[in-house]
Structures are given as structure tokens and as C-alpha cells.
Amino acid sequence: MYTCAPHFVSIKFPDLHSSKTLRPFGMSKREFKVFALASSVNEASNYIPAAPILIPEGPWNQIPGGVTAAKGFKAVGIYGGLRAKGEKPDLALVTCDVDAAAAGSFTTNMVAAAPVLYCKHALDISQTARAVLINAGQANAATGDAGYQDVLECADTVAMMLKVKREEVLIESTGVIGQRIKKDALLNALPTLVNSLTSSVEGAGSAAVAITTTDLVSKSVAIESQIGGINIRVGGMAKGSGMIHPNMATMLGVITTDALVQTDVWRKMVQTAVNRSFNQITVDGDTSTNDTVIALASGLSGSMSISSIDCTRAIQLQACLDAVMQGLAKSIAWDGEGATCLIEVTVAGTESEVKAAKIARSVASSSLVKAAVYGRDPNWGRIAAAAGYAGIPFHQNKLRILLGDILLMDNGQPLAFDRPAASKYLKMAGETHGTVKIYISVGDGSGIGKAWGCDLSYDYVKINAEYTT
């Protein structure tokens, strides 16, 4: 089961206290439900509402703050003149007061953006980081050596202002491929950005808005739990709406925690959590040039150091990381371009989690399954076919498929089911921007895996026909 935990951020529309249809200027129509609105947070975040964050149930509580919830972290987002039009915040900075254990996960695209190449190098030579700078507007991908030099100059400038080493400043970019960052505008905005840093909820909210592009909602979440009897916090923010396909998606993410963990262990934990979350979402089958998740651990909670991946404290922290990243990942799929609902695929009965996850990802990625969900068609044949071509062997006479709680196929045989009820289930999910749950069993193994996607609508084509990637 999952709990819907809205993150409260203001939007710049008067008298909005119920579900509405919002249409950003210049965008084609996309309908969604606004789950939570507030009316008086700082101006920098007054542009788009926040996504509902569907975090798994567990021994944690959701708290305000996003990336600033954990001890030692500050953040802010401002308008720096980087976007092609409008004055939505487009430049964000997240900092840590101390040297934080640093980890990163990146795109598998061979045309990796300049900031991706830079971050990989920085993490190779430094175990720690102090800051993450994120810009929206230009991807700085396929920009050659000039684009890489832009990254170095930006990192040098931030490092000088914060009095840290260049390699302790990590950089993420999102926007139009082939365009270098507007370096002069960015550099001119940095003094204001650094001077505006805050540990407040508002700082986290403004940063989450600043990193968005075609997103209609910002994605930010934080939880509090206990490790060894000590309270620790894990927070995060992410962006993504299109070009969402494993590995990761066109997505950027920053994760923070105040747990104390050795860097080598932290990096293994972060990659595991990414594999269970951002690598399990899909919107359109495209893999971006800029995918990046940076995760920082300040160690300021007072918890004992985690030095082994197999110890109890590591297992507890891993569960918290998984919860935060899965919540953010699902909000990205929920916000898929043109989408009317989230699709969650759960697969059981394989020999391992990895095999189950691969089948789940195959089904969630299927354009035919996505189109059937949008058409409110309970087409179990498309689900079975997508499971079958995932590349994981199973006996088809073990195949079992449910749509919600409606059994469509069992023991590899189609069943007589209430088709109007199944169609209504899909229709209700679309009308409320809810979740369509597909359950698949392929055998008697203990492996369980999940993947998330969204339906495929006419609006997806319209949005991407009108937007320069």
C-alpha cells in the first residue's frame, strides 16, 4: 500500500482551493488534479504546484523540507535569466555545511552532456562534495569542449564563493540539447543565488521549482526515521516529465541525508536505490543525455557510522533511500507529458528481484499497454505479450494477470471477467489522475519487482511536436 503525501508549495493563481485544470502558457492542454495548495510561500516558488508523492508505507514519517530537511543542508532557487521565455526560477543551488559523502548515478547515453562528464570526473577524484548547482534552459549536451569549459568556469566560480574545492561542486543541467548554458547570465546570478541560501522549507521548494522544464508539478519530499535509535532524515527533489526511460529518464535529482555513512558504502546504497526507482520508470522510451542523481550524506544526525553494506543500520537507511527515490520516481511518471494516470506494474514469482523488475519494466514501457490504458481498454493480451518479450524465461502456463483486483488471466488461460467493470477501473484512474495497478505472477519464485509508467495520450505527441528538445 502507498500513502499520498502532498508537499505544500504555493502557486500563482488566485482562489485555487480545489481540483483544477491548469494550462501553462504555450503548452497544449494537460489535465491533472491539484492535491494540495497553500497561499503564501515565498515568491520564487509561486509558479507551479507540487506533485503528490506516493511513498511506500514503512517506519518513517513524511516531514516538510525536501532537500533541506536533513541537518546541514541549504537550498534556493531563483530566476537567473536562463530560460527562453518567462521568469520561472531556472537556477538552483543545494549546499552542505560540511564535507558530505557524495554519490552519483548518470545517464547511459553515449552523448553524455558536459555536466555529466564533469560530475563523473569530480566524483572519481573526490569522496566528498559541498554543493550541487542546477540550471534549467540549456542542456549543455553535444556542445563539445566549449560546453565543458563552461562547466569548469561555473564550478570554479561557485567554489570560490563557497570557499571549497572545485571538485566539491557538482553541476546538473536540463533544457535544450545542443545549446550551451547562458554562462554570462548564470555567473551574474551566482552572488544572489549564494546569498539567498536557506535551510527553510521555502528554500527547498524554490529549488524544486527551479529545476523543472516541461514538468507541470515540482517534486520534493522528505522523511524522518530512526537508525540505531537515532532520528535521521532523508530528503530529495527531482524533475522529469518527458524523455523518461530507463536507465533513469530525462531526470535530475538531488538526495540529501544526515545519516553518517562511509562513501564507498553510500555509493553502493545510492545505486541500489536508483535501480529500484529512477531506473524503473518510463514515459516515452527516450533516454536523455543529462540524467543525473547526486546524493549527499552530511553525517550530522549523530547516528553511528555505517561502514558495511550488510549491517542493520545500512539496511534501515537503504529502506529510507528506496522510499524517497521511489516516491520521486513515481511522481515523475505521474507527471508524464500528456498523461492522465500513473501505471504501476508489480511482477512476482521470478528467481530474483532483478528478473521481476525487468519484466515489470517491459510491461510499463509498452506503448501498446500505455495506449490501451488511455483508451480504457482492459487488453490483457498486450500485457501478456510485453511480459513475454522481456527476455526473462518463464512457463506461460504459470502466467497470472490482474488489473486492480480484477483477475484477467490465470494459469496461462484467459478468464471470463467483467469487462465493463475493468473499463470503469481504468476510466476512474484517468478521470482522477490516479493509479492503474497491474499485477503479474509468472511462477513460484520469491523475486518481486516493480516499475512505473503512464498512459500514452494524443497530448504527448502534441506537446513534443511543439517543444524543441
Curated annotation (Swiss-Prot):
Localization of this protein: Plastid, Chloroplast
Chemical reaction(s) catalysed: N(2)-acetyl-L-ornithine + L-glutamate = N-acetyl-L-glutamate + L-ornithine; L-glutamate + acetyl-CoA = N-acetyl-L-glutamate + CoA + H(+)
Function field: Catalyzes two activities which are involved in the cyclic version of arginine biosynthesis: the synthesis of acetylglutamate from glutamate and acetyl-CoA, and of ornithine by transacetylation between acetylornithine and glutamate.
This protein's name: Arginine biosynthesis bifunctional protein ArgJ, chloroplastic
Note: This protein may be expected to contain an N-terminal transit peptide but none has been predicted.
Entry's EC annotation: 2.3.1.35, 2.3.1.1
Chief location: plastid
Swiss-Prot/TrEMBL keywords: Acyltransferase, Amino-acid biosynthesis, Arginine biosynthesis, Autocatalytic cleavage, Chloroplast, Multifunctional enzyme, Plastid, Transferase
Organism from which the protein derives: Ricinus communis
Ligand binding (substrate): T213, K239, T250, E337, N464, T469
InterPro entries noted in UniProt: Arg_biosynth_ArgJ (IPR002813), ArgJ-like_dom_sf (IPR016117), ArgJ_beta_C (IPR042195)
GO molecular function, one term: glutamate N-acetyltransferase activity
Subunit structure: Heterodimer of an alpha and a beta chain.
